[in-house]
Amino acid sequence: MCGGSGGGVLTAWIVGHTERFRAAVSMRPVINWHSFVGTTDGNNWYHQFRKYPWEDPLEYAVRSPLHYVANVTTPTMVMTGEADLRTPISQSEEYYRALKMVRKTDTLLVRMPEEFHGWRRPTHQLLQQLYLMAWFEKYRTQASKAAVPALD
């Protein structure tokens, strides 16, 4: 499974709650809602919560993918722009480091230099696709690989 921004949050959340997928890619995610509040350039996050994080820290914790990182067994790649102000790279770094510490699955952190919340440079757009294809190809089962005919 794969998602970016809000979809990146959902991807990280889902792999913390199921073993259904063979691989996942979480792009530009919010991983820790509590720390996100003080590092993002946006304020739309507040409409998803009833209170500020210092007023109800538990609500922010249970809605954060980081809270469920110990459950993740799906190989998960995390991809973010180094200059992203909407979902700062610190969110991706926090998740990547936690996945490494838990040691239950393979993980990779891809940092896009000088990129913001979307990739502006065509070379980075192409690079994203190459990373995605390589990651998902790596975790396809042998049976599904045999089912796909080779291109000549």
Residue ranges: model-predicted function:
Residues 1-152:
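Active-site-proximal cap/loop segments of hydrolase catalytic domains
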